[in-house]
Every structure is written in C-alpha cells, then in structure tokens.
A protein has these predicted regions:
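Active-site/ligand-binding neighborhood in enzyme catalytic cores
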Residues: 23-28, 38, 193-296, 300-303, ...
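N-terminal secretory signal peptides
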Residues: 1-39
C-alpha cells in the first residue's frame, strides 16, 4: 500500500509493465487483464463483506482486572492507545502520558475547514489489509468511504504535457526490464540481522543514483519515479535507499511476478479517522495524563523506572515503560545510562530517517476536476508547486470539495504556516496548468483562500511525517527499532517492520499490540 492513491496506481502500472514484458503481450492487453482481475476481486470482496468484517482486535468481553505491574505508556497516539487497549483486555491497567493537549498524534482529523466535511491533517488511507484499523472502525460504528472506486482518471503532468497511464506503462516496460536482475538478487527482507551482499550494495545505493543508471534515456519515467518516491517517503530520492523502490517489485517464491498486487481497495473514515482515537479514549479506564512531556528517563537501584515530565525533578515511577513517541522526539529526552539502551538501539534512535511530508488542504466551490475533466482529482507532476494531489472526503462533497496537496521532500520541509496564502496561490497557479481554470474555483473568505497547512516536520511532538529509510538503513537498523531494552518496550509506526505497515496507521496499531504482548509475556514469565 502507498500513502496516496496515485502512487498506488503507479505501482500497479509498474506491475503491469513487468507482466506485459514477462508474457510478451501488448500494454492494452495488460490493462484489459487488470480490469478483469479487478472486477473478479471486487465481486469476492462484496460477498465477503456481506458476511461482515472481523470483530474488534480486543472484543467487548475483556478479562476482569487483575493486580499487576505499574505500566507507563509514553505517547497517546494510535500505538499507545492500542497498547493500552490490549493490556486492558487482558485485565491490566496502564497510565498514558501524552505531551499534547489532545490524543491521536498524527491521526488528526480536520472538521472545521469545510463544515460537514472531514479531511486529514495526518494519516488518511486504510487498506483492506489493515485489519486492526478496520476492526476498530467497525467496533466504534465508524462509516467508511471507498477512495479507489471514485470515478475519473488520475493525471500525469510532466515535461510540459499530460501523459496517459498507457504511455507511462509503455515507458516503464523498458525500464523495469533493466531492473530484473537486481530484483532477483535481493533477499526481499533485508534487515540488520538478515541480508545478502546484493541487499548491502543496493541498500547503500541512493535511489536517485539508481534511477539515473536504470532510467538513462527515459527522462519521463525518471521524473515520474522521482516525484512518486519523494512523495511516498517524504525525502528526496538522493536521501532514500534504493531498496525503498526495489522492495515493491513483487515476486513470489517461484520468482513469478504477481501482476495485480494484493489489494485494489482502500478507505477513509467518512467523518474522520480520529473517530478511532475518540472511541479508544472513551473505552480505556486507566489514567490518561495530557500535557505530560517526557524530559528524562532514568532507573533506580531497585529497578524502578523514573519518569520526569515537563522538566520536573520529581519522578513518576513505573515497573515497565512503553515508549510510543517518534524517535525524532525521543532524541530530545535525557535517557540515563542506567536505563540500559544498547549501542545499536541508540544508533537506531539517533539516525533513523523521517520524511518531511506536509499536507495542505484547500477548499473548492465544486468538484471542478470531475465535472470539467472527468478526473478523480489525483495528479502527479514535476511542476514546482504541485507534486502529488488528491480529493479528500468525496462522500461528503456536496456544494463544496477539498483537495489535498501533499508537499514532500525539500518542498514539504520549506512550507511555512505563516506563508499559507502565498503558498496556496503558488499551488493554484501550477494547478491551473494541470486543470485549466481551476484557480477561480478555489473557495475564498474575503481575499484569503480557505486552506489549512499541517506541517509535521516542524511540529515539536513529531519532527517528521513518518519513517523514511536513508541509504544503508535497511541493513543497518531495520529490525532494531522494535527491540525492547529490558522492560522498556517500543511502539509507534517506526517500530513496525518496513515489510509490515511501517509508516501507516495500521503499523502504529500493530506495534502497540506487539508491545503489549511483550509486556504480557514478561508478566507470564515472572520477569516483571
């Protein structure tokens, strides 16, 4: 799964290009076969849906409360809350400490930009394979809207002109054939603990260099892939490992390409994804302390963990600690040597890469892209102020509509909330090239455009959008992020594996579940 609908489409285009080359068929036939596969899968999903989705990961019948250790959870985002939910289900109470005045972290819905609509300041998309997020949505009765089935096409605007998906695939067919040797040579699961020589070599090759070599003579695809991966991981391709790209060139165990991937559906919660946060907050019975920023973590000779908040010299005490804040933020916490982080764990915390994605949501008077251009609002371009865009909350778009501008890499980092109006104006000028006439359709209040910028790179409680491995970090730190340090456990999207759902809301939920299970195992074994 990708962080935007259009990149997911591009990845499927890459898959089709490989499939067409492998089967020696035309691009048009490959596209027809994709349509057939899509319809078959959707029929299956509709039948499966009639039987109902899975129950909550922690169903309503929780165990009775039992005496247990003092459990402190640092961070009240999806990871921390799902961890507390699992522990509560097993009968153990925990105390959550959240630095912000609200819960949710990067799961943060915006219901004020356009009345009656919900856009997402943070995590937006939920795939059919995201079982915990779907189960939570069902448990709390939260409606879902499909964001794949929306009518209309995505747009590719590069080198001063529009390109069709078929044209992009035709170019991709030549390029991906150059990469097959590398795809076959990598293990497919490179990590600190398991890697081959190709993993090491390609991990230490930045993606920009890799694309320069393998896309030589194909400037369209070089630009498309560059913009797509800057958007997907939030960092310039010169700051990304080439394994970010190669790991998605999917092969099964027989090295036969799976041309149509594993999912063609994704959702957004119609009235805002942080409905899951609200549901969990209402469900949890243990203390939740907001406005509590961890500033120091220590340990005494009795083995108790000492947690200092907001610069206080008087600690809270715990027997076990789950840290679910981003490593970018943890770097600013004084962690005393007595806590016992290993050198490898410390290196992972201090060096892991994060993207600089920032989201600007802009209100429009209508779905101009749909009515005038038969587009679903998705576009990828090499224009200075339009990278990756999509329509948000289509289900609630009546007299108004919302478009999300996904600023990434250097552009995302450079955006500023105090320059919102000039930035939106520059965006609309470029968007007017992709969808001529659209600038006049943007909604204004007086002389100002109605828009909101959520700038995660400068948010002191995030300091980045989500995990983005730098060159060398698959073989250098993948697998270390989730490792416990004694009775200090770690959760958060960054601690879920790259090969699972790192960078997604589902990854945060899964990491919370894992951390809780680590605590439960320690209780069972008598370690705590």
């Amino acid at each position: 799964m990708s962080h935007s609908r259009l990149l997911e489409q591009l990845r499927r285009s890459i898959q089709i290009a490989q499939f067409c080359e492998q089967e020696n068929i035309s691009t048009s036939e490959g596209l027809e076969r994709r349509e057939e596969a899509t319809h078959s899968r959707r029929r299956f999903l509709s039948m499966a849906g009639a039987a109902g989705f899975a129950l909550s990961p922690m169903a309503a019948f929780a165990s009775r409360k039992v005496p247990g250790p003092r459990i402190a959870i640092i961070g009240g985002g999806l990871a921390g809350l799902s961890c507390a939910d699992r522990l509560q289900f097993k009968g153990y109470s925990s105390t959550i400490y959240e630095a912000s005045t609200r819960l949710g972290g990067r799961c943060f819905s915006n219901r004020t930009l356009v009345p009656g609509m919900a856009c997402e300041n943070g995590g937006e998309f939920i795939d059919t394979s995201h079982k915990m997020m779907i189960a939570y949505a069902n448990e709390f009765g939260l409606a879902k809207e499909s964001v794949i089935k929306q009518a209309g096409d995505e747009r590719f605007y590069f080198a001063g002109q529009h390109w069709t998906e078929a044209q992009v695939i035709d170019e991709l067919r030549v390029v991906v054939s150059n990469m097959q040797g590398d795809v076959r040579s990598i293990s497919g699961s490179a990590s600190f603990y398991s890697k081959n020589q190709s993993d090491i070599n390609l991990d230490n090759t930045d993606l920009a260099t890799y694309l320069d070599i393998n896309c030589a003579g194909h400037p369209l695809i070089r630009s498309v892939l560059d913009e797509a991966y800057v958007s997907e991981y939030g960092a310039e391709t010169s700051q990304q490992s080439s394994l970010n790209f190669l790991s998605y060139m999917r092969f099964n165990k027989q090295s036969k390409f799976e041309p149509f991937g594993t999912s063609d559906e994704r959702y957004h919660l119609t009235h805002g994804n942080d409905g899951v946060i609200e549901g969990l907050e209402a469900k949890l019975l243990g203390p939740i302390n907001k406005g509590a920023k961890l500033t120091r973590l220590s340990r005494n000779i009795a083995g108790e963990y000492l947690l200092y908040f907001n610069g206080s010299t008087i600690p809270e005490k715990a027997d076990v600690v789950i840290i679910s804040i981003p490593f970018t933020v943890l770097r600013g916490v004084q962690v005393d040597p007595l806590v016992g982080f290993s050198a490898d764990k410390t290196r992972a915390i201090q060096t892991i890469g994060y993207g600089t994605n920032a989201k600007t949501m802009i209100a429009f008077n209508s779905r101009y892209w749909a009515t005038e251009f038969n587009s679903n609002g998705g576009a990828l371009s090499d224009l200075p102020n339009v990278q990756n865009i999509w329509e948000t909350n289509r289900a609630n778009a009546t007299s108004k509509a919302i478009m999300t501008d996904y600023g990434s890499g250097n552009r995302g980092a450079a955006l500023r909330t105090n320059l919102l109006q000039s930035q939106v104006n520059a965006f609309l000028n470029d968007l007017n090239v992709v969808f001529p006439g659209i600038k006049a359709n943007a909604t204004k209040l007086g002389s100002n455009y109605i828009a909101h910028l959520e700038h995660w790179p400068s948010n002191p409680l995030a300091l980045g959008s989500y995990t983005s491995y730098k060159p060398g970090q698959f073989t250098g730190i993948e697998g270390l992020n989730s490792e416990a340090s004694g009775l200090v456990k770690f959760a958060g999207e960054h601690t879920d594996s790259f090969y699972s759902y790192q960078g997604f809301m589902e990854g945060a939920c899964l990491s919370g579940l894992r951390a809780a299970n680590q605590v439960l195992a320690d209780i069972k074994s008598g370690t705590i």
